[in-house]
């Protein structure tokens, strides 16, 4: 039976390392010796069948596999009876208290033993296939993926295959060439024949691909991986010369100017492109060439297919400037760099420099790398350099960190949202005012955050490797990952400050002030001096004109680092609380930070009064954070036009059932779009309720808040959980991400703040 293992790792292995005893690590293992009871097996099968039956209605899984395990291990039984509120009935303080206690008791029960909250953080259909591609090429597919792994990966593909045979870029999206080609190749590499698979999965996918022009219409990223696999020719891709790494770092086209994720994808790809690496052309690869292309492989004019992209995949078309640049490099620059003498000197020097940076990034992240797109590319680059090398073996030891199991099957995560979910969840629990009842939960969560803070900067001379400092920050996931994140740091800092005001006998010893100062230093470093907005990973400042060179047809704003409303708002809240407790530490800088950050948030407000959410869906998410930041800075409905307009947006967006609901289409279209039929979701409703409470709506007319909370209370499930509904996360405008814990965190937080701040009858 599958089991989720927490904070475990082989400490005797020479290939795996940890900075904090694996705190936050979460890996799935199949234990053939685990004696599952008939009841356990029945629960798991019921969850799988329920998802499969409703898979076209609710795309994100409820993430039940580990929840069933944890609740069973803790023998959790919900003892607080459910409450429902009738249409004309008032919500009393007693009713609100019961709802809060039910949600808090369930949420506490699903905390891991190291203090964090596990959860799925997946959704893109292109995360897992490159792991399969890489392991197939290197000959380690069967060693890493057991029969049980393959079974669950196929289950995931079957569950998320659309009725037309294709897969989207993400689980909610329409069928795309990118998702469908990746899904098809994955099924074939895992052992299915061309006409195998549940409900003719392979044949249906292949038909979709060929009906939409064949594999030559796959977007640029897909062309790269297919060239590596031997299903495409490098001559059919855009140039990615490694020589850019040899330029001065201040040069506008040096990768140092790129957003970190973009830079770390380009890094191994430029190495593989520079070597023109192609995996072994096996009989299966030769079969796939015939199956995926609509004309004989040897007759394809590769030069002409470089700019092709299937219409369903095209969100961000290439600019004329970009196409001229690609063509210039393809026709002039690359032929020079690949001929003597430059191929013997300059190209080899560039490849050596690129590999040096790959090793630096691998070592800095304990061979986890920054994310799931980068991981298989860096792992493959290490194998190409030395198939029996230590670096590749260290990569293999961290592959399992990326895989997640749900009732819909096995998928790959971004890496994990351990710290982010924990920081938000702890604030929701703190708002409950139930310290005596949930003290152990709070203490464990506090302990996790203290152990998860990044204590050092990246190894060695990090500035020459184009890295920002990380000491004092928190990551999105765990400490071993090492990549600093501004809003994760701000939300974790808020938690630690709140815990510092509580009894150490209850929540443990408070964090040392010097570590708080380190966190403050990091946040201050990422504010844009011109706009006042806060970046996420590294300083923003590279020319936005570089976005014209975005080669990824289905994503936007990924070439350079930007500033974001949500991150800025989180930092304001953290600094206001920090300033209260440490009024003399960097006072002038913090005061100036808050003033400029408020101006930035006000400037970013849209015409309808909302704020665009860059990391959550979408205008409801962004508005909740923006209103919270403005309110923390002392802005009110009476002295701030932005708050008045934000409230007006939320009130107009409320649905007839009292809740709120927003379509993921808001993100790519950049226009607020309600769900079909103006349906509501518990997460969007909670975000709107929190936003209205931040803005002081209860002081004017609490009716909209009461209606929203009534929707939340009546949506509560028997055991204290909330229903999984629409997907809630996003990145780069057009790719959705499933934050499975949001359905617990935000409704609990909204109920708790409602009980604390909205006057209710006894």
From Swiss-Prot:
Q: What is this protein called?
A: Tirucalla-7,24-dien-3beta-ol synthase OSC2
Which organism was this protein described from? Answer: Ailanthus altissima (Tree-of-heaven)
What family classification does the UniProt entry report for this protein? Belongs to the terpene cyclase/mutase family.
Q: Name one GO molecular function term.
A: beta-amyrin synthase activity
Kindly state which keywords UniProt assigns to this record, in alphabetical order.
Answer: Isomerase, Repeat
Catalytic class of the enzyme = isomerase
**Pathway assigned in UniProt:** Secondary metabolite biosynthesis; terpenoid biosynthesis
Swiss-Prot/TrEMBL catalytic activity:
(S)-2,3-epoxysqualene = tirucalla-7,24-dien-3beta-ol
In the UniProt record, what gene is named as encoding this protein?
Answer: OSC2
Q: In which tissues is it expressed?
A: Mainly expressed in roots, bark, wood, stems and petioles and, to a lower extent, in older leaves.
Q: Please tell me whether the keyword Repeat is annotated for this protein.
A: yes
The catalytic activity of this protein is classed by the Enzyme Commission as 5.4.99.56
What are the GO cellular component annotations? lipid droplet
The answer, when asked if Isomerase is one of the entry's keywords, is yes
- What are the ranges of the PFTB repeats? 100-142, 150-191, 442-486, 516-562, 594-634, 643-684, 705-746
Question: What is the role of the protein in this entry?
Answer: Oxidosqualene cyclase involved in the biosynthesis of quassinoids triterpene natural products such as ailanthone, chaparrinone, glaucarubinone and amarolide, allelopathic degraded triterpene lactones inhibiting the growth of other plants, and possessing antimalarial, antifeedant, insecticidal, anti-inflammatory and anticancer activities. Converts 2,3-oxidosqualene (2,3-epoxysqualene) into tirucalladienol, generating rings and asymmetric centers in a single transformation.
Tell me the InterPro entries matching this sequence: SQ_cyclase_C (IPR032696), SQ_cyclase_N (IPR032697), Squalene_cyclase (IPR018333), Terpene_synthase_CS (IPR002365), Terpenoid_cyclase/PrenylTrfase (IPR008930)
Provide the organism lineage as a comma list: Eukaryota, Viridiplantae, Streptophyta, Embryophyta, Tracheophyta
Q: Name one Pfam family in it.
A: SQHop_cyclase_N
Q: Where is the active site?
A: 487 (proton donor)
Record-linked PROSITE patterns: TERPENE_SYNTHASES
């Amino acid at each position: 039976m599958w089991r989720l293992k927490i904070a475990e790792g082989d400490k005797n292995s020479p290939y795996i390392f940890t900075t904090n005893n694996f705190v936050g690590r979460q890996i799935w293992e199949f234990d053939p010796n685990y004696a599952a009871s008939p009841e356990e097996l029945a629960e798991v099968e019921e969850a799988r069948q329920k998802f499969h039956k409703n898979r076209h209605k609710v795309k994100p899984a409820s993430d039940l596999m580990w929840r069933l395990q944890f609740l069973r291990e803790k023998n959790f039984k919900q003892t607080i009876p459910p409450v429902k509120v009738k249409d004309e009935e008032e919500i009393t303080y007693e009713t609100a208290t019961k709802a809060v206690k039910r949600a808090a008791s369930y949420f506490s029960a699903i905390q891991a033993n190291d203090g964090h909250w596990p959860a799925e953080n997946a959704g893109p259909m292109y995360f897992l296939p490159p792991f399969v591609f890489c392991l197939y090429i290197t000959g380690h597919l069967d060693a890493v993926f057991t029969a049980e792994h393959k079974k669950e990966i196929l289950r995931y593909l079957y569950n998320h295959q659309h009725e037309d045979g294709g897969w989207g870029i993400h689980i909610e999206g329409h069928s795309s060439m990118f998702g469908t080609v990746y899904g098809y190749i994955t099924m074939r590499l895992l052992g299915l024949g061309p006409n195998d698979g549940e409900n003719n999965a392979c044949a249906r996918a292949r038909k979709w691909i060929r009906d939409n022009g064949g594999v030559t219409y796959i977007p640029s990223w897909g062309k790269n991986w297919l060239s590596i696999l031997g299903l495409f020719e490098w001559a059919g891709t855009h140039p990615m010369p490694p020589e850019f790494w040899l330029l001065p770092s201040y040069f506008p086209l040096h990768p140092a100017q790129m957003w970190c994720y973009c830079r770390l994808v380009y890094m191994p790809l430029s190495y593989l492109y520079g070597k023109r690496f192609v995996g072994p052309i096996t009989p299966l690869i030769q079969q796939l060439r015939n199956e995926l292309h609509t004309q004989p492989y040897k007759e394809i004019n590769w030069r002409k297919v470089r700019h092709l992209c299937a219409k369903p995949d095209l969100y961000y078309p290439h600019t004329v400037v970009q196409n001229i640049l690609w063509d210039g490099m393809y026709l002039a620059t690359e032929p020079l760099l690949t001929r003597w003498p430059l191929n013997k000197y300059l190209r080899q020097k560039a490849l050596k420099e690129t590999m040096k940076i790959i090793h630096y990034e691998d070592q800095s992240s304990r061979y986890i790398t920054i994310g799931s797109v980068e991981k298989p590319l860096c792992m493959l680059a290490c194998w190409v350099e030395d198939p029996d090398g230590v670096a590749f073996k260290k990569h293999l030891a961290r592959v399992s960190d990326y895989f997640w199991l749900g009732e819909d099957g096995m998928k790959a995560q971004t890496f994990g949202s351990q710290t982010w979910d924990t920081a938000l969840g702890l604030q929701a629990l703190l708002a409950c005012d139930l310290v005596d009842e949930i003290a152990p939960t709070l203490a464990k969560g506090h302990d996790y955050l203290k152990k998860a803070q990044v204590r050092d900067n990246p190894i060695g001379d990090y500035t020459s490797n184009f890295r920002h400092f990380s000491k004092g920050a928190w990551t999105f996931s765990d400490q071993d990952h090492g990549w600093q994140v501004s809003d994760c740091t701000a939300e974790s800092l808020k938690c630690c400050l709140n815990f510092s005001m509580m009894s150490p006998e209850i929540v443990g010893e408070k964090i040392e002030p010097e570590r708080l100062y380190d966190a403050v230093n990091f946040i201050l470093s990422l504010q844009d001096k011109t706009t006042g907005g806060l970046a996420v990973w590294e300083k923003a400042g590279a020319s936005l004109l570089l976005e014209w060179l975005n080669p990824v047809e289905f994503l936007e704003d990924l070439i350079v680092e930007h500033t974001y409303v949500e991150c800025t708002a989180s930092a304001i809240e953290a600094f206001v609380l920090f300033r209260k407790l440490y009024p003399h530490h960097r006072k002038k800088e913090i005061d100036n930070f808050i003033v400029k950050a408020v101006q930035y948030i006000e400037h970013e407000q849209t015409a309808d009064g909302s704020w665009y959410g860059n990391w959550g869906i979408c205008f409801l998410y962004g508005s909740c954070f923006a209103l919270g930041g403005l309110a923390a800075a002392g802005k009110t409905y009476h002295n701030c036009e932005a708050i008045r307009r934000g409230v007006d947006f939320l009130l107009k967006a409320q649905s007839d059932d009292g809740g709120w609901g927003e379509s993921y289409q808001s993100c790519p279209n950049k226009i607020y779009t309600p769900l079909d039929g103006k349906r509501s979701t518990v997460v969007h409703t909670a975000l709107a309720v929190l936003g209205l409470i931040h803005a002081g709506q209860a002081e004017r007319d609490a009716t909209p808040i009461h209606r929203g909370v009534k929707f939340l209370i009546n949506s509560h499930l028997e055991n204290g959980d909330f229903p999984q509904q629409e997907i809630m996360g996003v990145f780069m405008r057009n790719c959705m991400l499933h934050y499975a814990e949001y359905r617990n965190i935000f409704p609990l937080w909204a109920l708790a703040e409602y009980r604390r701040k909205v006057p209710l009858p006894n």
